From Swiss-Prot:
Protein family membership: Belongs to the RING-type zinc finger family. ATL subfamily.
GO biological process annotation, one example: protein ubiquitination
Domain topic, free-text comment: The RING-type zinc finger domain mediates binding to an E2 ubiquitin-conjugating enzyme.
CDD domains tied to this protein: RING-H2_EL5-like
Topology with respect to the bilayer: Single-pass membrane protein
Gene: ATL38
Broad enzyme group: transferase
Ranges that cross the membrane: 15-35
Protein's name according to its UniProt entry: RING-H2 finger protein ATL38
Catalytic activity: S-ubiquitinyl-[E2 ubiquitin-conjugating enzyme]-L-cysteine + [acceptor protein]-L-lysine = [E2 ubiquitin-conjugating enzyme]-L-cysteine + N(6)-ubiquitinyl-[acceptor protein]-L-lysine
Pfam family, one: zf-RING_2
Taxonomic lineage from the root: Eukaryota, Viridiplantae, Streptophyta, Embryophyta, Tracheophyta
Organism expressing this protein natively: Arabidopsis thaliana
Segments for region (Disordered): 279-302
Zinc fingers, RING-type class: 96-138
Alphabetized SUPFAM superfamilies for the sequence: RING/U-box
C-alpha cells in the first residue's frame, strides 16, 4: 500500500512542472509581444524618414547631374513655327514626339541642333531637365568635341525608339484642335507601362513610330544660321544683363560651361546641321566667325 506522504509529494511535483511550463509560456509570449512592438516602432520611424541626410544629398546630386543646365537648354534654337513653316525642307506636317500634336503657327518650338528633331519648347524642357539626350533618338546633347561624334548616332538608337521612347512612358493623343500648353497636357493621356525588359513576352509595349521624318525639321542653311545667331545672342544678352545687375544665380564655373557650350555649338553648327539634317557641307560664314570671336571675348570678361 502506498504511503500517504508519497502521494502528496507526487502531486506537488506535478503542480511544480505545470507551473514552470506556464511561466515559460508567459515569458515567451511577453518577449514576442515586446519584439513585435519594438519592430513596429522601428519600421514606423523608417517609413517617416527612410533616408539619412547623406542619402538625400547623394540622391539630389545624382538627380541634378542627370539633366541639362537651364542655360544650356535655353541655348538650343527656339522660334515660332510660323517663322519657319514656309521655309522648311520637305512636305507634310511636323509633329511633337512628346504630345503627338501637329505644330501650329503660334506655338514656340525648340530644335535639337545635333539631330534636327523638334519639339514644343514646354514639352521638351520637362524631358531635358531630367535627361541629357534627345527624347527621340537619344543622341547625347552634351558631347564634347573630343568625344564620339554626335553627328552619327548609333543606328540602334533610332530603331530602339520604337520600344524605348521616354523610358516606357507612352503619350497618346486623339484630338488636335487649337490648344495651349495646359490643354495639350489635358489631351495627352500618360500611362505607365513596363519598359523594354517586357519585350520577352513577344510583343511591343509601346506604340511604334513608323515615320521619324514627321518629328524632324530640316531647314536651309541660311535659315539655320539666323535661328542659331538669334538664340545665342539672346542668351548672351540675358547673361550679360544679369551679370551687370548682380543677380547671378550660377557659379562662375557654370557660366563658363554655358559659354563654352555656345562656342562649341557655333564651331560645330555648320558640320552638324549639314550632315545630320541632310544638307550639304558649307564653310562657316564671316558672321559665324565674328559671333564666335565676340562670344569668346564675352566669356573672358566673365
Amino acid at each position: 500500500m502506498v504511503q500517504p506522504g508519497t502521494e502528496i509529494k507526487a502531486s506537488d511535483l506535478t503542480l511544480l512542472v505545470i507551473t514552470i511550463i506556464l511561466f515559460a509560456i508567459f515569458i515567451v509570449g511577453l518577449a514576442s509581444v515586446c519584439f513585435r512592438w519594438t519592430s513596429r516602432q522601428f519600421y514606423s520611424q523608417e517609413s517617416i524618414n527612410p533616408f539619412t541626410d547623406s542619402d538625400v544629398e547623394s540622391r539630389t546630386s545624382i538627380t541634378a547631374v542627370r539633366g541639362l543646365d537651364e542655360a544650356i537648354i535655353n541655348s538650343f534654337p527656339t522660334f515660332l513655327y510660323s517663322e519657319v513653316k514656309e521655309r522648311r525642307i520637305g512636305i507634310g506636317g511636323v509633329e511633337c514626339a512628346v504630345c503627338i500634336c501637329e505644330f501650329e503657327d503660334h506655338e514656340t518650338l525648340r530644335l535639337m541642333p545635333e539631330c534636327c528633331h523638334v519639339f514644343h519648347a514646354d514639352c521638351v524642357s520637362v524631358w531635358l531637365s531630367d535627361h541629357s539626350t534627345c527624347p527621340l533618338c537619344r543622341v547625347d546633347l552634351c558631347l564634347q568635341p573630343g568625344e564620339r561624334s554626335y553627328l552619327n548616332p548609333e543606328p540602334d538608337l533610332v530603331e530602339s525608339t520604337n520600344s524605348h521612347l521616354f523610358d516606357g512612358v507612352t503619350w497618346t493623343n486623339r484630338n488636335r484642335p487649337s490648344r495651349s500648353w495646359s490643354t495639350r497636357l489635358s489631351q495627352c493621356r500618360v500611362s505607365q507601362i513596363l519598359i523594354s525588359r517586357s519585350h520577352s513576352t513577344g510583343h511591343s509595349v509601346v506604340q511604334p513610330l513608323d515615320n521619324l521624318d514627321r518629328f524632324t525639321l530640316r531647314l536651309p542653311e541660311e535659315v539655320r544660321r539666323q535661328l542659331t545667331k538669334k538664340t545665342v545672342d539672346n542668351v548672351a544678352f540675358s547673361q550679360a544683363r544679369s551679370s551687370r545687375r548682380g543677380y547671378r544665380s550660377r557659379s562662375a564655373g557654370s557660366e563658363r560651361s554655358v559659354f563654352s557650350y555656345q562656342r562649341r555649338m557655333h564651331s560645330f553648327s555648320d558640320c552638324a546641321w549639314s550632315t545630320s539634317c541632310g544638307g550639304e557641307a558649307v564653310a562657316p560664314s564671316k558672321d559665324s566667325r565674328r559671333i564666335s570671336v565676340e562670344q569668346s571675348q564675352l566669356d573672358d570678361r566673365v
